[in-house]
């Protein structure tokens, strides 16, 4: 299970040794060792809120997801948020409580997750954990069975959120989530294409298989919209990045047709 590890790792030299070791073990997906390190850190300083946050995440990272482990994490996170909802640990706790409601709980609560993400973005918009919440919020809002007018209101909410995002990864993921929902659920290439193009233009889509998928989708959307030179550029980019991909032969044919059409 992926865990987003943020603030405690950015001040490595200043961290107490056991707390630092705990976060390092979490980053290596070693929850038992992380829990041991955080227990030692808390024995030395029971008020260490970042070690308490780490201990909660170690429960969530256990390979065996059980109601007991999720409940243990939830209790630690609730206490952190209740004591102080404005420091790094309290804001992190709010984020992970929303994640529990969305994906970790054995009885997921979409409404609680939505409320948690919205509250983070409203109260702490520039905080890294709030930025992480943005694409999660988009996913929950857009992939829900709601009437068309409500779905459009949700699209508008995400569109209004995008200019407030400052973390490149959060901006990329939120744009891509919206773009793919527009295509998959509405076949709305006109609104989706600028989102795809902006991500590719910013150079923030780098890893396979995401780059593979986004290049093909941007090319297809551009082609459908009659932007043939842009479609050809994306197809050519794809072939340069992934010459041996299983789709390469078909992409070459599509590129050839566009080039032939442009040069009769």
Regions found by a protein language model. Give the residues of each.
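N-terminal leader/linker segments that initiate helical-solenoid repeat arrays
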Residues: 2, 6-64, 68-71, 88, ...
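TPR repeat positional signature
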Residues: 18, 52, 56-59, 94-97, ...
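Residue-level recognition of tetratricopeptide repeat
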Residues: 23, 57, 61, 99-102, ...
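Structural motif corresponding to the intra-repeat A-B loop/turn of tetratricopeptide repeats
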Residues: 28, 62, 67, 104-107, ...
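Short solvent-exposed coil/turn linkers within tandem alpha-helical repeat scaffolds
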Residues: 41-51, 80-91, 106-107, 121-132, ...
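TPR/TPR-like (Sel1-like) alpha-helical repeat modules
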Residues: 114-123, 135-138, 228-246, 253-256
